[in-house]
A protein has these predicted regions:
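Accessory alpha-helical/coil subdomains and C-terminal extensions
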Residues: 1, 116-195
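Structural motif
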Residues: 36-37, 194-196
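Structural recognition of the beta-strand scaffold that forms the well-ordered cores
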Residues: 40, 66-67, 197
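Short Gly/Thr/Asp-enriched flexible loops that form oxyanion-binding sites at enzyme active sites
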Residues: 40-63
Length: 201
């Protein structure tokens, strides 16, 4: 059984924000016991951000949450969206012989690669191979068959129920230092009203 839910109006991925992440978590939590897995169709600009956020917001996750999308609109002749969607659904429904999910974590599926959500970055806006996981190997590769990598896939504690988190504090800023950065820029960031945390990368 496949069911669908759509935001009304649809959200452009460039407008994604924590409130929408919380809504996604709410939908997954409400339907958690009714489905084997979940597929989220998402624009590519902020897909990696959403996947990373959901991986932390869905504590004790034991079912697949697969994000996918396309580089070309799904209505165009050469779109990659149809294959990405069909394969994402197959992965979300895939089970081990004991009935547990093969990939019980938040992932991005794109161009024949299944990647851990919080390790994935968008690297290209022109090619179908738009995402890459630099510091962690793909969890599965897709050709004629889907080849999973069981040793790389997170093993959930099935004794623990899903624990959803909804609140994000947005009073946080990321600062990248580089040679020649002006002291006034750093000072301005440090004195933003209500700022609770500054992350240096």
């Amino acid at each position: 059984r496949i069911s669908s839910y759509q935001f009304d109006p649809p959200i452009d991925s460039s407008d994604m924000e924590p409130a929408f992440w919380a809504k996604l978590v709410e939908i997954i939590n409400y339907n958690y016991n009714s489905f084997d897995g979940f597929v989220i169709l998402h624009g590519t600009d902020t897909m990696a951000y959403t996947a990373s956020a959901l991986s932390f917001m869905l504590e004790n996750l034991s079912k697949p949450v697969i994000l996918t999308g396309s580089q070309l609109p799904i209505g165009t002749l050469r779109t990659d969206g149809k294959e990405n969607l069909i394969t994402a659904i197959e992965i979300a429904a895939a089970k081990n012989p004991d009935g547990t999910a093969i990939v019980p974590e938040v992932c991005i599926f794109f161009e024949n690669h299944l990647m851990r959500g919080n390790r994935t970055t968008k690297i290209n806006a022109e090619n179908f191979n738009a995402f890459r996981s630099f510091n962690y190997p793909p969890l599965a590769r897709v050709g004629i068959h889907i080849k999973y990598e069981p040793n790389l896939i997170r093993k959930p504690d099935l004794s623990k129920p899903l624990k959803p988190h909804y609140l994000f504090d947005t009073n946080v800023v990321i600062l990248t230092l580089f040679p020649g950065i002006q002291e006034g820029i750093v000072s301005a960031l440090l004195h933003v009203p209500g700022l609770l945390s500054l992350i240096h990368i």
